[in-house]
Regions:
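Short, surface-exposed ligand- or partner-binding patches at beta-edge/loop junctions that are enriched
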Residues: 210
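C-terminal accessory "lid"/substrate-recognition subdomains
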Residues: 1-189, 195, 204-206, 215-221
């Protein structure tokens, strides 16, 4: 079965996010500056993996076997977008910023008009954006939390469970009692309904992107 180029690009990005060791092969065919630039791009996606340079696929065995590097939960949580969501003010790495790679979190308490958002994503989404992931709120189904994800040129919007605030009052309070951290993002008007997208890009116009996303928002109620 043929695999679409966009699918390969998306798969590679997700593999980088979930790895503990990453091999950069054929480093003898590019300049030191290009290697440094590539490492910066990798670090914008994955903060913790050990990066090993190689030529002709020759990698020391000690870098591959019995390294004790892989830990499932650590790998699961090592993607740079997760760190940025948890610590939105602490993710600017000088190594990454040097190559004009920027990470920011777009958070809003207004829902998206789904048609406007879809039109923007399909027709005007900037190529400079490398990766996006996070919960999204839209008026077509205001009680449902959606997950929006972009990796390379592939984009997906999928259901990710109901917002807690949409539950009946008794059930809502039970969920909050069992998960008190929810109150850290709770709003008196919208509850836990919100959009919070981690956006990673290179040479992107952050202000223009924010303005375009804001133009897709609408009022609720």
């Amino acid at each position: 079965e043929d695999i679409d180029e966009d699918d390969i690009e998306s798969l590679l990005i997700q593999q980088i996010e979930f790895c503990s060791t990453l091999i950069l092969n054929k480093t003898d065919t590019v300049s030191p500056e290009q290697i440094a630039e590539l490492k910066a791009i990798v670090r914008s996606l994955q903060k913790d993996a050990v990066i090993v340079e190689a030529q002709n696929g020759e990698v020391p065995m000690e870098e591959l076997l019995d390294t004790d590097r892989f830990d499932f939960m650590r790998a699961y949580n090592s993607a740079a977008w997760i760190e940025a969501m948890e610590h939105p003010e602490e993710h600017d790495d000088p190594e990454v910023l040097e190559y004009d790679i920027e990470t920011f979190v777009y958070s809003r308490r207004k829902p998206f008009d789904l048609k406007k958002f879809t039109d923007f994503v399909e027709q005007e989404w900037p190529d400079e954006v490398i990766r996006v992931k996070g919960p999204l709120w839209q008026t077509g189904d205001p009680d449902m939390c959606y997950m929006f994800e972009q990796a390379g040129h592939q984009m997906r919007l999928m259901e990710n469970g109901l917002f807690v605030d949409s539950a009946p009052e008794g059930e809502k309070q039970k969920i909050i009692d069992e998960n008190p951290e929810i109150m850290q993002i709770w709003d008196d008007e919208t509850g836990d309904r919100m959009t919070s997208l981690c956006i990673i890009g290179r040479h992107m116009d952050k202000d223009a992107l924010i303005a375009s996303l804001d133009a897709c928002l609408t009022d609720w109620h």
